[in-house]
Amino acid sequence: MREIKSFEKWVKKSLKEHFIFKPYEEFFIVSDGYVGFKILNKCKDYRKVIEEQTFQDLKEDFKIYNRKIEKIGIADIQKEFDISNKEKAIKMPFVYDNIYKARIFKNKENLIFVDDNFLKNIDLYNYDIYAGDPVHPLVFYSKDISYITLPIRMCNFEYEIKEIQGELKCN
């Protein structure tokens, strides 16, 4: 129930700026350009939220940008949710807080920083996490709903994470 309320808040916020809806045969995808949801059609509550907020029948794709509605065209958002070319990642028990408050994820030797605000839309503990490299979207995967978010790109960013007396300090 908490996730559907978070989703509804996200939809309302996205409609003010940028919102994309793309239906497929077994699922649909919604995105605001920074995060996205891939939701099976059997999850009718999520579909109902979108219908109520957009006043659309959800049979065709559309985007809303600056409160204007248009047809998308041939954009294939589905490939971003593909986990076959990504490795399983883990959530590190640290938060990086310099300019952004960011969560840290790790796959292989890569640390991937994600804006904490992008993670408020889901309960992380309900998902398996997959990541490629630090510049491609992370996929939070469950059998009914998958979620993607863009990482904070930190090229040549040198960081050192230290835990001092139970407190995390980042230099």
Functional labels for PLM-detected ranges:
Residues 32-36, 40-41, 48-171:
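C-terminal functional regions that serve as terminal interaction/effector modules
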Residues 1-25, 29-39:
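Intrinsically disordered, low-complexity linker/loop segments enriched in Gly/Pro
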